Amino acid sequence: MSEPDAPTPLDPAELGFERIRYEKAPPRATITLNRPEVLNAFDFKMLRELARACEDASWDDEIRVVVVTGEGRAFCVGADLRSWGAELIDNPRLYWKWFGAFKDMHDRLREIGKPTVARVQGIAVGGGNELQMACDLAVMADDAFIRHVGPEHGSVPAGGATQWLPIFVGDRRAREVLFLCEEIPAAKAAEWGLVNYAVPRAELDAKVDELVEKLATKLPQTMRYTKQQLNWWRDISWHETVGHARDWLSLSMLNDEAKDAIRAFLASRDDG
């Protein structure tokens, strides 16, 4: 598709997405990660499609709220390590480009200019938790959990977690989440402020609908600037560190520790 002449929103069908579903029912747009066979893990194309959907939603004045969710039993489990193992190990230049797409997706989502709600219907691991933290509000099914596994799999969780977890849950709890790599049940995630609500699965959509209905009544320009002011806390930590993280993680693709950890994880999946 050629580049548009103006910031004109499109019908989702015109965008031809393959890795996500993008739906508009004003005042709501819904972005659904749609790779359930790999627990909605990010590959390069998904990152690009997410960024483009966020751009389109930001251009559409009929859209007042954006909901982000996943298809199947996972919200998102972060990066697709199979694509990493096949393409990025021993290839820091390609990883640098991959992380650029990841960063661009996050920037588009945070700077979308309207409230966003994460509908966390399943597990959120690694970059999946970073994705829900990039949203303004989050509602989580009470049988789901959040977990970070970077220190076990050879990847520093610097795509949002090292920057934002201390803001969300405090420094000590952030270290607990990232160092121990243990599951954080939905109830604890809500208690800690990592999500806003943990609700029974049968009530998940009703709670999301309630938030969307309330948010859609607010003045859009005032909401946009309120969001921008609140984003200062996240943005300052993000912009001060993410460039360094991109370079360091790229070089880590040459490191035996990272390579061995990724290969061991992939071997365990194959054995399972």
Regions found by a protein language model. Name each.
Residues 78, 99, 103, 126, ...:
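Glycine-rich phosphate-binding loop at the start of an alpha helix
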Residues 31, 35, 50, 68, ...:
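Terminal peptide-recognition signature
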